[in-house]
Amino acid sequence: MITFVDSAAKERERESDKCLDPQLWHACAGGMVQMPPVSSKVYYFPQGHAEHAQGHGPVEFPGGRVPALVLCRVAGVRFMADPDTDEVFAKIRLVPVRANEQGYAGDADDGIGAAAAAAAQEEKPASFAKTLTQSDANNGGGFSVPRYCAETIFPRLDYSADPPVQTVLAKDVHGVVWKFRHIYRGTPRRHLLTTGWSTFVNQKKLVAGDSIVFMRTENGDLCVGIRRAKKGGVGGPEFLPPPPPPPPTPAAGGNYGGFSMFLRGDDDGNKMAAAARGKVRARVRPEEVVEAANLAVSGQPFEVVYYPRASTPEFCVKAGAVRAAMRTQWFAGMRFKMAFETEDSSRISWFMGTVSAVQVADPIRWPNSPWRLLQVSWDEPDLLQNVKRVSPWLVELVSNMPAIHLAPFSPPRKKLCVPLYPELPIDGQFPTPMFHGNPLARGVGPMCYFPDGTPAGIQGARHAQFGISLSDLHLNKLQSSLSPHGLHQLDHGMQPRIAAGLIIGHPAARDDISCLLTIGSPQNNKKSDGKKAPAQLMLFGKPILTEQQISLGDAASVDVKKSSSDGNAENTVNKSNSDVSSPRSNQNGTTDNLSCGGVPLCQDNKVLDVGLETGHCKVFMQSEDVGRTLDLSVVGSYEELYRRLADMFGIEKAELMSHVFYRDAAGALKHTGDEPFSEFTKTARRLNILTDTSGDNLAR
């Protein structure tokens, strides 16, 4: 009897033996890479998959138009590594979801099940990445180990020996064990890998700019991985800017190029370079993309290969993230922030930007695709010059109203001049938009107003007097009957759709009135005893008082004194602990005193100086010249301080506790926790997070 063996099954069995530990794979891929859990729903974007194969030229899809996105369920994920370069990649097996199955579970069935939630809560293993210097990559040299890595990742070193030395065993992504000699020596003393390091450099063909990753597993084993250097400066090697300009050099202070969400400009002349030392070699072939797209359209299972270090966005995106992003009605002028990872994946930074246009990237082949839907401009264009288009689910919305930019050094009596933004008409003329803000939502344009009124931010210097009153600046309550042609409300009956069953939702309708612009006041303004509450101008979260409001504060203090003498307890000074409380009318028509951050601005019938210390301090990461502002007045304990710093810099809280130092008002250097937190908030003016707490760094 002859037995036939399934060749595909044998191949899968052989590949299963080569699969990596998921934790080591993620350590090599970078902290921002998130693979979809098994059994979760994702949207597969053939357009994004084609970008993975553009080293061979544009991908052509014969036999009709391919849909922009296909809803699929993840059947399996295999974490693997290239046998020649050690570059990690993943093979994702997808099963298209039938049309009659798409509406059953909704957003709740997007992969955040019990298994996915448990995996997300698991504590990540300790890992450390370092970009190799020229000295580290020299043949015959040694590797300078950062102190943090030596003390937290490597086995404990016996410092009583002279000199302290040990043998370190590290397993690479293929299971090969490498032996290094770890010694602590020199003047000043430092940790070094000596014997065995040159062999590792030669075998792995490491050069300066490559990154080395060390990870300690749960059972104490040490693993080592590699991240190849990206050529071409900002944007990674896969994105070379269109000729004639040469590829930019890395910006000073850190190259924000190498990470999975770093996007390139979609110019036709762009080519994908290779990571294999200058050879133009795409890891994914165009025919593989065409085959996967055809299988997806026909509803058959298919497999895709994803390289997280390829500097192209993930093309298998969590379904819930896409749906949530497309519920937003995008239009020009929206402010957003987006996370980027440094070249060695050691730090995550957020960059601010503005939506400059909302337009499909390829209207010929993908007319309804949300892929790279947003054209953006950045507040720091030098670092992000190649990032010209982004997908909506990669950004976090900060403000959905265009900012009103005021002259930063205007004279105090200069009248307010509001620029005539086409998206924000002031004079009653409402132009019909030429392009809808969301091309996927038919009938909804950038001039649509939302049932949920959102305040608009005002940027610029303080203005003591405006040509128009602040209350007049409110475009108060436009009735739906007055809205012109082309100004649509979101609570219409029909839900627009895009390809493959993706429904573009809208917020729940509340009433037929919406407020286009609100400055520093709630959306529901009510009168009390015929008096209108004055609006308040906010700058960086603090109230800016005009001369009129200051005079009102004097009058209010007199009224409060009179009402208190009459025994009316309701008219006493408001001493609430809210961050900012504006003047308001109470039941008897008197006005409560102004307060800022819980400190009354009226005392002894006189207005206090509003320029007092606000409890802010600057936070600096080691080797950074630019600090970040932290408001200590909203922090209640050292535990909350460490949590905020961990979220700000993407560092584990446990790693921060012994590395945060500060200088008080007298300039003395102290460690957080040396004094009570209440005293710390009063004296701290500068925080320093030192990854290396040696004496030289502390002296700085």
Swiss-Prot record:
<keyword id="KW-0927">Auxin signaling pathway</keyword>
<dbReference type="GO" id="GO:0005634">
    <property type="term" value="C:nucleus"/>
</dbReference>
<keyword id="KW-0804">Transcription</keyword>
<feature type="domain" description="PB1">
    <location>
        <begin position="614"/>
        <end position="697"/>
    </location>
</feature>
<dbReference type="Pfam" id="PF02362">
    <property type="entry name" value="B3"/>
</dbReference>
<keyword id="KW-0238">DNA-binding</keyword>
<dbReference type="GO" id="GO:0003677">
    <property type="term" value="F:DNA binding"/>
</dbReference>
<feature type="DNA-binding region" description="TF-B3">
    <location>
        <begin position="128"/>
        <end position="230"/>
    </location>
</feature>
<feature type="compositionally biased region" description="Polar residues">
    <location>
        <begin position="565"/>
        <end position="594"/>
    </location>
</feature>
<comment type="function">
    <text>Auxin response factors (ARFs) are transcriptional factors that bind specifically to the DNA sequence 5'-TGTCTC-3' found in the auxin-responsive promoter elements (AuxREs).</text>
</comment>
<dbReference type="InterPro" id="IPR010525">
    <property type="entry name" value="ARF_dom"/>
</dbReference>
<feature type="region of interest" description="Disordered">
    <location>
        <begin position="560"/>
        <end position="595"/>
    </location>
</feature>
<feature type="compositionally biased region" description="Pro residues">
    <location>
        <begin position="239"/>
        <end position="250"/>
    </location>
</feature>
<protein>
    <recommendedName>
        <fullName>Auxin response factor 18</fullName>
    </recommendedName>
</protein>
<dbReference type="GO" id="GO:0006355">
    <property type="term" value="P:regulation of DNA-templated transcription"/>
</dbReference>
<keyword id="KW-0805">Transcription regulation</keyword>
<dbReference type="InterPro" id="IPR044835">
    <property type="entry name" value="ARF_plant"/>
</dbReference>
<feature type="region of interest" description="Disordered">
    <location>
        <begin position="234"/>
        <end position="254"/>
    </location>
</feature>
<dbReference type="InterPro" id="IPR015300">
    <property type="entry name" value="DNA-bd_pseudobarrel_sf"/>
</dbReference>
<dbReference type="InterPro" id="IPR003340">
    <property type="entry name" value="B3_DNA-bd"/>
</dbReference>
<dbReference type="GO" id="GO:0009734">
    <property type="term" value="P:auxin-activated signaling pathway"/>
</dbReference>
<comment type="subunit">
    <text>Homodimers and heterodimers.</text>
</comment>
<comment type="similarity">
    <text>Belongs to the ARF family.</text>
</comment>
<dbReference type="InterPro" id="IPR053793">
    <property type="entry name" value="PB1-like"/>
</dbReference>
<dbReference type="Pfam" id="PF06507">
    <property type="entry name" value="ARF_AD"/>
</dbReference>
<keyword id="KW-0539">Nucleus</keyword>
